[in-house]
């Protein structure tokens, strides 16, 4: 008789939802940032790619310095600050009066988004309520669904309510990660890991 795969816990579902939102915002920046600059600010195609360049550059910088950031702020606060920063970055894009302010917003979004998904995968691997490989598989489904379907969802939504409004909704979703993060700490191992990663 085939073994029954355990159902995801509430904490795992929250981790997955966090990854979905984070990858959704990455997809929005990757596939729609240039279009946004062109439609909102009439930026030429030769310059529209700067939006994703700013996003990607700060994301890489954030990833490379992630271990230092986590060591300084602790895991819990890193996610809290990262989600807030990412949300504010995308809101900067939405309310930017000129296109180069939107570039700053995309850069802030990239920096804020850099460590959210890696930390969620790490937390899923440390929890003890489900086998590690099963927990990671559930979180991966959410994460890569956001990555694959995100750009299409943004496009579909933009046809209905407009691209700025879609970005605003995603920004609210990013900020909501600060709440969802509190719901992923049920396993005792997460609290223990927080002690080891937070400076005395």
Q: Locations of the language-model features?
A:
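Intracellular juxtamembrane helix-capping segments at the cytosolic ends
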Residues: 114-128
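Short amphipathic helix-loop junctions that connect adjacent transmembrane helices
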Residues: 31-47
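Small-residue hotspots at the loop-to-helix junctions and early N-terminal turns
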Residues: 45-53, 133-137
């Amino acid at each position: 008789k085939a073994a029954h795969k355990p159902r995801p816990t509430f904490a795992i579902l929250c981790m997955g939802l966090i990854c979905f939102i984070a990858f959704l915002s990455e997809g929005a920046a990757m596939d729609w940032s240039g279009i946004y600059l062109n439609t909102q600010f009439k930026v030429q195609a030769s310059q529209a790619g700067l939006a994703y360049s700013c996003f990607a550059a700060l994301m890489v910088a954030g990833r490379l310095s992630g271990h230092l950031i986590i060591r300084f702020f602790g895991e819990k606060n890193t996610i809290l600050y990262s989600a807030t920063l990412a949300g504010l970055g995308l809101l900067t894009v939405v309310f930017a009066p000129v296109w180069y302010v939107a570039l700053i917003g995309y850069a802030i979004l990239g920096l804020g988004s850099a460590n959210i998904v890696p930390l969620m995968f790490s937390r899923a691997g440390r929890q003890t309520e489900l086998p590690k490989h099963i927990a990671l598989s559930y979180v991966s489904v959410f994460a890569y669904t956001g990555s694959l379907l995100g750009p299409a969802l943004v496009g579909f939504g933009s046809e209905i309510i407009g691209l700025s409004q879609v970005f605003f909704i995603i920004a609210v979703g990013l900020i909501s990660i600060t709440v969802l993060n509190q719901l992923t700490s049920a396993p005792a191992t997460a609290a223990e890991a927080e002690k080891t990663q937070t400076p005395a």
